[in-house]
Amino acid sequence: MRNHWITMLLVAAVCAVPAARAQDSFTPMPLDAGFGPLDFTPPAIPAAKIIADFTAQEAVYRDALHHYTYRRTARVDTIDDDTKKVSGEYYEVDDVIFDPSGARTEKVVYAPPSTLDNGGIMMSPTDFQDIEHNYQFVLTPENIGEYDVKYVGRQRIDQVDCYVFDVSPKMIEKHKRYFKGRIWVDTDELEIVVTNGWMVPDDTKPGHEDLHPPFMTWRQQIDGHYWFPVYSVGEGMLHFSPQDGAMAEDVHIREVVKYTDYKRFGTSTTILYDGQDITKNGPQPGGQQPGAPQPKK
């Protein structure tokens, strides 16, 4: 987010939000009561083997997602902490579809004029990049070389048993952004089911400041096979420092993105899952799913 009225040197901080469990440097968004206690016992399988297996499965998931259409509904609000009401809003509904040639594209379904300038900010290109891509973070053999991945332990989310990993970029290349945070990987399906962290770095160059809140993304199984994103939420207090005589300003921001109506697009490409051809419609979701929270009003 960029400040709409003044340019300032900025520092990011997480908004104080009630949490059932404590936060740390790798879980900037609070965890609800669905997250059980962490088991720090070393895994029976070497962590390197788990990482290799789940990143390979993430590549399969990423490729499968490219064969689905879905609807994305994004809402970005500024919150007046005195009244607890929304002071500005960006809202857009898009269908992620395929054009007649089979190329992936997006169609705007509904996009009223943004009122975020009422709250003192405006959307930046990296905000759109987060909504369209980064909140659906995947860790595959292609990009894992950019990250340090540390095994933390095992944890149950609702009824789903998960491996827990902390992820951070090894180095920051200019003009690139990276995920830093924690991921939960289903111990059976070996796919990421929850992501909690930031996209880093923020731009702190005077005159180009661009802040973003931490975020959390939940996935659920679609047609019994893949854990696709269904809900992302980001929330934080953006602290803008004074400059050129202007007063300091804090902006409370909340972002909610929903992903719905997944449908497999007709394709001649064979999609393999666990060595089996599942290109045709597979079974409906079964088993346990971690529950995403309901959006705040």
Segments predicted by a language model, with ranges:
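Positively charged n-region of N-terminal signal peptides that target proteins for export
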Residues: 1-4
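Sec/Tat signal peptide C-region and signal peptidase I cleavage site
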Residues: 18-22
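Structured extracytoplasmic
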Residues: 23-180, 187-194, 198-213, 221-224, ...
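Bacterial N-terminal signal peptides
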Residues: 7-16
